[in-house]
Regions:
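Functional surface patches built around histidine and acidic residues
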Residues: 2-156
Length: 156
C-alpha cells in the first residue's frame, strides 16, 4: 500500500493510494537481505537501485525515523494485516525533519527482493519510490510466521 501526505496541509492527505494486500510468494535471494548491510539498509539499497535505474537521486537513510517505521511493521505483524499510518501519525513521526511531502509503502512478503519487486509493479508504490522530491527514507522490518513485514517512509 502507498500513501503520501503534505507537510503544508495539516488537514489531510494529498493522496491515499491503496492497492490491496501484498501477500507474496517466495522469491530468489535472501529472505531478510544482505547480512553485511542489515535488512533495513538492504531494503533501502534495493529501493536506491530502482531509483538509480530510473535516473533518480539515491535516498539517505533516516535512522531516527526508522524506529517509528519498525514499530509500525511490528504492529502490523502482531495484528496480522497491513495498514497505513494515519496522516496525523506520519506528520508526528516527521516532526523535526525538513520536509514538504511524505509517503509510506507497507507490505508483507517472503523476501525483501519480492517486496521491492511488488512495490515497483504497483503504480502507487512505484510513484512513492520514484518521486523526485524525496531525498530520505526510513525502513522498518518485522518478522513473523516466516513473513517479512515492511514499512518504508519517504520524505523530502
Amino acid at each position: 500500500m502507498a500513501r503520501a501526505t503534505s507537510g503544508r496541509r495539516l488537514g489531510g492527505l494529498l493522496a491515499l493510494l491503496m492497492s490491496g494486500l501484498l501477500l507474496l510468494g517466495a522469491a530468489s535471494g535472501s529472505a531478510v537481505g544482505d547480512e553485511r548491510l542489515g535488512p533495513r539498509r538492504h531494503m533501502l539499497a534495493l529501493t536506491n537501485s530502482d531509483r538509480t535505474h530510473h535516473h533518480r537521486a539515491t535516498l539517505s537513510f533516516a535512522e531516527r525515523l526508522a524506529a517509528y517505521a519498525k514499530s509500525h511493521s511490528e504492529a502490523m505483524a502482531n495484528q496480522g494485516y497491513i495498514y497505513h499510518s494515519t496522516g496525523a501519525q506520519l506528520r508526528e513521526a516527521l516532526e523535526g525533519y525538513k520536509w514538504e511531502l511524505g509517503g509510506e509503502n507497507v507490505g508483507v512478503g517472503a523476501s525483501l527482493e519480492s517486496l521491492e519487486d511488488a512495490f515497483m509493479a504497483s503504480e502507487p508504490h512505484r510513484k512513492n519510490i520514484l518521486r523526485r522530491v524525496y531525498d530520505h527514507a526510513a525502513v522498518g522490518i518485522a518478522r513473523a510466521d516466516d513473513r517479512i513485514w515492511v514499512t518504508v517512509i519517504f520524505y523530502g
